[in-house]
C-alpha cells in the first residue's frame, strides 16, 4: 500500500501546490469490498467543494495516464477537506497546532494510557508537552515524538 500512497503523493503534490493548496494526507484503504484513494487538501480559510473537484479532475487525469497503473484494482477517488479533526503528520502541522486541543495515540503506554487528549503547550524536535486533565487534575505530560503513533486536532467538549 505504501508504494501506492508514495506514487500518488508524488503525482498529486505538484497539482495541489500549483493551486496554492496543501496536500495534508493521502490514504489508500479497503472498506468492505471497495478500495478508496483519499486525498485531503486544505488552504488558509478552508477548502471548498469546487476546489476539491478541480484537484480530483486533475489527479484523475494524471492517474489515468500512468503506465503501468500503480493501482490495478478498481477504486474510488475522493478529494476532501481534512475536516475539524485534521491529522498532524509533519513537524509544521504540530507547530501550527501549538495552543490547540489535540488527540494523541501512542505506540506504548505512558503512565496508564496509550491515548491522551489535551492542549499542545510546546514542542521540541524530540518531544511535545501536552496539558491533560487526569482525574480532575491538570498536568503537563511530556511525550517523546517517537512514541506518537498518530495525532490529530480534536474537538473539546
Swiss-Prot record:
Entries under Pfam families matching the protein: DUF150_C (PF17384), RimP_N (PF02576)
Subcellular localization: Cytoplasm
Keywords noted in UniProt: Cytoplasm, Ribosome biogenesis
Ligase in keyword set: no
This protein's record includes keyword Cytoplasm: yes
One GO biological process term: translation
SUPFAM superfamilies in the cross-refs: YhbC-like, C-terminal domain (SSF74942), YhbC-like, N-terminal domain (SSF75420)
HAMAP family listed in its UniProt record: RimP
General function of this protein: Required for maturation of 30S ribosomal subunits.
Protein family according to the UniProt entry: Belongs to the RimP family.
Protein name per its UniProtKB record: Ribosome maturation factor RimP
Amino acid at each position: 500500500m505504501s508504494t501506492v500512497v508514495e506514487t500518488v503523493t508524488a503525482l498529486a503534490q505538484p497539482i495541489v501546490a500549483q493551486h496554492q493548496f496543501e496536500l495534508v494526507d493521502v490514504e489508500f484503504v479497503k472498506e468492505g469490498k471497495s478500495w478508496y484513494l483519499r486525498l485531503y487538501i486544505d488552504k488558509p480559510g478552508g477548502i471548498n467543494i469546487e476546489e476539491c473537484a478541480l484537484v480530483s479532475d486533475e489527479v484523475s487525469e494524471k492517474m489515468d495516464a500512468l503506465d503501468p497503473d500503480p493501482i490495478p484494482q478498481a477504486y474510488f477517488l475522493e478529494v476532501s477537506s481534512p475536516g475539524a479533526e485534521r491529522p498532524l503528520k509533519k513537524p509544521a502541522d504540530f507547530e501550527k497546532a501549538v495552543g490547540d486541543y489535540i488527540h494523541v495515540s501512542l505506540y506504548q503506554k505512558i503512565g496508564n494510557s496509550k491515548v491522551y487528549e489535551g492542549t499542545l503547550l510546546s514542542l521540541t524536535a524530540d518531544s511535545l508537552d501536552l496539558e491533560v486533565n487526569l482525574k480532575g487534575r491538570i498536568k503537563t505530560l511530556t511525550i517523546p515524538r517517537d512514541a506518537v503513533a498518530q495525532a490529530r486536532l480534536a474537538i473539546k467538549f
